[in-house]
UniProtKB/Swiss-Prot annotation:
Its main location: virion. The gene is HA. GO terms for biological process: endocytosis involved in viral entry into host cell; fusion of virus membrane with host endosome membrane; fusion of virus membrane with host plasma membrane; viral budding from plasma membrane; virion attachment to host cell. It comes from Influenza B virus (strain B/Singapore/222/1979). Homotrimer of disulfide-linked HA1-HA2. It is found in: Virion membrane; Host apical cell membrane. This is Hemagglutinin. A lipid is attached at C579, C582 (S-palmitoyl cysteine). InterPro entries: Capsid_hemagglutn, Hemagglutn_HA1_a/b_dom_sf, Hemagglutn_influenz_A/B, Hemagglutn_influenz_B.
Length: 583
């Protein structure tokens, strides 16, 4: 006879735990924050560069002016500005200009006293305009000016295109024709003759020489007085009689006399005046200028193109929003100078890899994400970890990481806006001081740069603070997302961890990270299937009744034994029974 006994064994599985976590990194970087000082992070975005010196170049996307008149050979920019006979040419329009002459000279024309007037500024003033043209007609009739008639003087040291005696096109050397006598101050009005609403730059001056030459030319050996006035700006001069070295300061031809040259800027419709005595250089052709061209000290030739022109470093291509090193004026799409290197956090706080189960124990590993990070979050900063019989599984939450990246991008954009505002502020200051572009107070400029540098550094510190502090925000969002997905299939045990009622291996965790997790799918195998075992009993002389008798006897004996043991324990606990053990 054969009997079958069916044994039902229910095998339950150990629960897994899922936690939110942060990635780890083996190459920490350091950023500065507003309140935490220096903090190690998993990644940074360098915001500064230290440039090296290079040649000057043309600014990208705009016309850059080197020499005022590129086609005027053997001419300085001052020659062009004064209208030297052999230096008459077209000045091309430009949005940017290079101040390449440290000390302007006239290159063989009449010697000028550079230390007496604003003559050095004249070429620089013209460089500051985008469009520059010389008028086709004279602003006044010099021959018939008050105190005349005059002969228009020329000089062999200022030859014209035919190598005859000549003089500057912007001025007429008014030498009395017949009445070579002393005169009281005379006044001439200078009208506005530009036709396109431009600024009118009117050049004028006076001649000084030895007493002998002054009497010969003008009939008066005494110092002469001169005054110019335009737009509320008045300038006074008294001529010097004699005492000039034979060799000119600019290396030109030997001369006993000198000329002093000045200019005045007349706004549209405004009339200027010149009060003069003998030896006056009356204005003739005038410059009509419009638009703005940014000016910077540099050198020629211009080679290639660059984003930025920097007085100390030459042509720069902008790779970072800020730079460290030597501060100086710059034009174009330039980085802003800051005192120290700046870095923006591009990741999370640095955490060493969390220890695994065998090193720290089960509950130690669960808490690992609080003080350590998890390796394996490919392309992600925040994510999930699963701990169980399968070991440790890790998956990145790319959406959360993207949100963190978006916040960093927003911080970068905010810093860029701050950069643009500061650049506009600097440009505005440059425009306001346009007419004295070479006279900017370096101390004031450095103070402005220091202030802007401090503002930018503080903005970066605050940005880093916000990025690092946002980790808690991202982890809390992940925790809410995880709790919603797990639903009733898990129990919240705190600290961003959940104990599941089912297994959660790498596949399960990947689906959670991807947002495709279905609790029902993984909850089905919470209990293993019933294991049904068939026991075959052979006929060896025992009948069914005998077997049942043995089974019932054993079960009854076990029940009685348990009851007696429980009774003894109860009596001992009530002190009704004592037990002594003797050896």
């Amino acid at each position: 006879m054969k009997a079958i006994i069916v044994l039902l064994m229910v095998v339950t599985s150990n629960a897994d735990r899922i936690c939110t976590g942060i990635t780890s990194s083996n190459s920490p970087h350091v950023v500065k924050t507003a309140t935490q000082g220096e903090v190690n992070v998993t990644g940074v975005i360098p915001l500064t560069t230290t440039p090296t010196k290079s040649h000057f170049a043309n600014l990208k996307g705009t016309k850059t002016r080197g020499k005022l008149c590129p086609n005027c050979l053997n001419c300085t920019d001052l020659d062009v500005a004064l209208g030297r006979p052999k230096c008459m040419g077209t000045i091309p329009s430009a949005k940017a200009s290079i101040l390449h002459e440290v000390k302007p000279v006239t290159s063989g024309c009449f010697p000028i006293m550079h230390d007496r007037t604003k003559i050095r500024q004249l070429p620089n003033l013209l460089r500051g305009y985008e469009n520059i043209r010389l008028s086709t007609r004279n602003v006044i009739n010099a021959e018939r000016a008050p105190g005349g008639p005059y002969i228009i003087g020329t000089s062999g040291s200022c030859p014209n295109v035919t190598n005859g005696n000549g003089f500057f096109a912007t001025m007429a050397w008014a030498v009395p024709k017949d009445n070579k006598t002393a005169t009281n101050p005379l006044t001439v009005e200078v009208p506005y003759i530009c036709t396109k609403g431009e600024d009118q730059i009117t050049v004028w001056g006076f001649h000084s020489d030895t007493e002998t030459q002054m009497v010969k030319l003008y009939g008066d050996s005494k110092p002469q007085k001169f005054t110019s006035s335009a737009n509320g700006v008045t300038t006074h001069y008294v001529s010097q009689i004699g005492g000039f070295p034979n060799q000119t300061e600019d290396g030109g031809l030997p001369q006993s006399g000198r000329i002093v040259v000045d200019y005045m800027v007349q706004k549209p419709g405004k009339t200027g005046t010149i009060v003069y005595q003998r030896g006056v250089l009356l204005p003739q052709k005038v410059w009509c200028a419009s638009g703005r061209s940014k000016v910077i000290k540099g050198s020629l030739p211009l080679i290639g193109e660059a984003d930025c022109l920097h007085e100390k470093y030459g042509g720069l291509n902008k790779s970072k929003p800020y730079y460290t090193g030597e501060h100086a004026k710059a034009i174009g799409n330039c980085p802003i100078w800051v005192k120290t290197p700046l870095k923006l956090a591009n990741g999370t706080k640095y955490r060493p890899p969390a220890k695994l189960l065998k090193e720290r124990g089960f509950f130690g590993a669960i808490a690992g994400f609080l003080e350590g990070g998890w390796e394996g979050m490919i392309a992600g900063w925040h994510g999930y970890t699963s701990h169980g019989a399968h070991g440790v599984a890790v998956a990145a939450d790319l959406k959360s990481t993207q949100e963190a990246i978006n916040k960093i991008t927003k911080n970068l954009n905010s810093l860029s806006e701050l950069e643009v505002k500061n650049l506009q502020r600097l440009s505005g200051a440059m425009d306001e001081l346009h007419n004295e572009i070479l006279e900017l107070d370096e101390k004031v400029d450095d103070l402005r740069a220091d202030t802007i540098s401090s503002q930018i550094e503080l903005a970066v510190l605050l940005s880093n603070e916000g990025i690092i502090n946002s980790e808690d925000e991202h982890l809390l969002a992940l925790e809410r997302k995880l709790k919603k997905m797990l639903g009733p299939s898990a129990v919240d045990i705190g600290n961003g961890c959940f104990e599941t009622k089912h297994k959660c291996n790498q596949t399960c965790l990947d689906r959670i990270a991807a947002g495709t997790f279905n609790a029902g799918e993984f909850s089905l195998p919470t209990f293993d299937s019933l294991n049904i075992t068939a026991a075959s009993l052979n006929d060896d002389g025992l009948d069914n009744h005998t077997i049942l008798l043995y089974y019932s006897t054993a079960a009854s004996s076990l029940a009685v034994t348990l009851m007696i043991a429980i009774f003894i324990v109860y009596m001992v606990s009530r002190d009704n029974v004592s037990c002594s053990i003797c050896l």
